Structures are given as structure tokens and as C-alpha cells.
Amino acid sequence: MNRPYAKLTITKKGERAARSGHPWVYGEEVTHVEGTYQTGDIVDVYSDKDRYLGTGFANDISKIRVRIVSRNANDRFDEAFWQRRVKYALDYRKTVMGDKDFACCRLIFGDADDMPGLTVDRYNDVLVAQTLCYGMDQVKPVIFKALVDELAAMGVTIRGIYERNDVKVRKLDGMEEYKGWYEANFLPQPGSVLTTIDENGILYDVDVENGQKTGFFLDQKYNRLAVAKIAVGKHVLDCFTHTGAFALNAAKGGAASVTAVDISQEAVDMTNENIRRNGLEAIVTAKQANVFDLLTDLAEHKCHDYDFIILDPPAFTKSGHTVRNAMRGYKEINLKAMKLLPRGGYLATCSCSHFMRDDLFRQMLHDAAKDAGVRLRQIEGRQQSPDHPILWNVPETNYLKFYLFQVV
């Protein structure tokens, strides 16, 4: 087969992963290189039996040598190819999210959309993008133009694309850190970095420049509705509230009172603004505190003011090497929460790290309940919303765990 790309031959272990559908080829799996390439170039991947396995972006700087983007040897990686990818991603979101939720959702989710390292979130008329793969960074002008054009065809006008490339992991792929509005002749002057969204009937201010991740945690959209359903008449403690999304959904669902806690004063200020915007000052109170210290203090004072506790911490581990330490952190907060809740109380608990596998998270909860002397009655076990699709052959796309329990 006469191919225009450099050819990388990989080990049997790498071949098994590639044939199973995993898009990553690690540097130690490459045994032979035929031809030359530069970082960001398209290369072919072959087995040691000379079987074609896929084509993707190469990067000798990264631990991941190749990120496969196609397994069709007939594909041409021109503008039309990426336009098809974008259209496919948008059509999927339009179908699974519906018209209303499509206005505020994740449009592109990296490997789950065969666009490795690329995240694009939509907040009404603003898109927020993050590029963590050198090759995708090179083709982003085509991707961004396709997004604006396809959304326009759906009747959506985009006023700006904000790049949140201010993350250290970009350096691992040989790219600089920065953030700011993407400039292109197909985009108008973007205006403010603040925008307002409506999720589940609740209004939020989103700061795309300074907010965590891309400005808002879209993946918990439907898990918040599960909390709202249980919150009726409850006294709720929402830990790690960020901008107050779980707290506000609980209040909107009929909670008697909600206390929202975060260690960041900036997050508390944003939560207070969202409380006022939704007219929920009589129900929700936001306070700045370290959740670990707060739970300890409540336990020492034998406080039983809350019959519903929500734990949505940041990722305690971003590496497989620190999972054991992370489990101790997760167990500590869950154990304390279980001890604080009365019999018949409710606990919503989450982990957003894919390194914290579901079986490990469940085992941690089992151990915490045992040590707390309680039993857990599971109401729901959920994952991220479907705009963050899970590919079963790419376990890294399955990262969010959400469990809702009654303590009995």
C-alpha cells in the first residue's frame, strides 16, 4: 500500500489496544519507524505483521506517541474530513440533549468524538475550547470554522470562541499555556467574558475567562435533577459547591434550607450572585470554609442540622500513582458525612477522576459505611450527562461517578 505518511510499527501489546479501539499508542510501544515526520504530523500505525491499524497525530514529546483519529485507510485528512467530524458530533448532541439542553452542553469531548485532546463547550452564544493535543491544535482553525458554520445552519449565532489553554498539561505536548478570545474573520467582536446560562430552569453567571475548567461543570446537569427530586423539605449541606449548582437545584426542588460551602471565596461570591439572580436568598446561604475542617467541627459539636449532604469534591487524584491517597481523602469526607446524617438521611457523593474506578469508589463507600456503623440504601447510581459520551473501548472517557443513597 503506497501511503504518503510515515509508518510506525508497534508491539503486540500496542496492537491489541489499537485493535480493541483504543486511540493511544505509547512511545515504548513503537518498535520501528519508516519515513520521517514532525510533531503534529499525520502518521500511519501498523502491526509487526504489517497490518494497518490506524492513522493519527504523532508527537515525540508526549508519552502518547500517536493519537489515532481514523481506522479507515481511505480517509483524506482535509477540511471536509474535519467538517464531517464536527457535524457528526453536533448532530449527536442535538439528538441526545434536545433543543433546550443543546444550548448549554459539551459539543466536543476529545477521544469520544475522535478529535483527541479537544474539548469544546457551548454556553449559548459563546464557545469555550481547550486543546491538549499538538496535532489537533494545528487543525483547530478548520474545526472552529466548521463549528460556527454548522451551528449557523442550525439557527445558532456564535459571538465568540474563548480558548482556555491555560493548563500545564499542554506543556507535555510541547505547547504553550495561554487563554483569550480566538481571532478569526468569521467571528464578530466577542464582547464580555461573562455570559448567563439557563440549566434546569436555574440561571447562572458563567465566567469563561476565570471559572474552573471552561467556566461551569456541565457534566452534572442531570445528576442535579436527581438531587432536586430528593431535596423536598430537607435541610441540605452542599460541600464543594463551586458556583452553587447542586445547592440551587436543591432549593429549586423544595429544600427547607441549603448551606453551600466552598474553600474559594471567589466561588462563594459567584454562588451568592447566582442565589440572588434566582431569588433564593431565603433558602440558600453560601459560606467560605474548608470542607474537611467543617465536617470535623460539625461532628465534634454533634451537629445534626442536616438530613441531606452533597459531596462533589474536585478530583483527588490525577494520576494512577496517587489513587491510594485519594481513596483516603474520599473515605474521610464520606465517613464524616455518614456520621453526621440521621437515620433516614440522604447522601449524594461523587468522584470526577477516571483513575478512581467505579469498583474502587464503591469499595471505599462500603468501607466508610462499615466504619460509620450505617447501611447505605442506593437510590441512584449515575455517570456524566450524555454530551460527555462514554466509549467502552476508551475507559478514560468514563470518569464521573455519582451515587445517591439513603442512610439506614
Residue locations for each model-derived region?
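S-adenosyl-L-methionine
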Residues: 266-310
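Conserved SAM-binding loop of SAM-dependent methyltransferases across substrates and taxa
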Residues: 243-256
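Conserved class I S-adenosyl-L-methionine
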Residues: 233-242
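Non-catalytic substrate-recognition/targeting regions of SAM-dependent transferases
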Residues: 110-121, 141-216
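Mobile active-site "lid"/loop adjacent to the S-adenosyl-L-methionine
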Residues: 306-336
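C-terminal catalytic and target-recognition region of SAM-dependent MTase-like enzymes
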Residues: 305, 332, 346-408
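Conserved SAM-binding motif I beta-strand of class I
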Residues: 257-262
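Non-catalytic accessory regions of SAM-dependent methyltransferases
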Residues: 1-124
